[in-house]
Amino acid sequence: MAGKRHFDTPFNLYHLSEENHDGQLFEPRSMDKMRVMEGENWKTPRICVSSSNDGAVSAVVDSMSYPTGLKLWVHVPQNLLELFSSNKVYKPSLRQVPDSETTGEHWLKAPALMKVIGQIEVIDVDYSANLYYMWDGEKTRMDRFNWKWTVHFFRN
């Protein structure tokens, strides 16, 4: 379904979770300082989303130990058009999130009603994807993961 829009918005934004949050209203929140990468802004209240499942998987599992078989529910904000029109979708700077260009991370700065569009399973690390970002003046490698849909719903 690459490139297909789930709602009438400029592009898709995805949020991954080990739990199914279908129909739940997410509120922006500050991050736990221990769960963000070094140098990442943890104080700004937000809901983290990515412009691609690849980026979202890299952002979520980068801090874990290569979770082969990990299943993640894929959510999209059902009120994304409203969030765009009210300027509540924010692209963090590299200073705020050093790997944001690689992961496609965006922040939702207002409540978002989540809709599950499926579930994916992490298969393995894609060592051929040479992804890098700059951190503290140094080129830092980031892993990309192969994954597959285990359940996929397409809903408008």
Where are the regions a protein language model picked out?
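Short aromatic-glycine-(Arg/Gly/Cys) micro-motifs in beta-strand/loop hairpins
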Residues: 18-40
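Short, hydrophobic/glycine-enriched beta-strand segments
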Residues: 12-18
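Conserved NAD+-utilizing ADP-ribose enzyme module
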Residues: 2-11, 38-47, 53-156
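A structural detector for beta-sheet-dominated domains
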Residues: 17, 29, 73-77
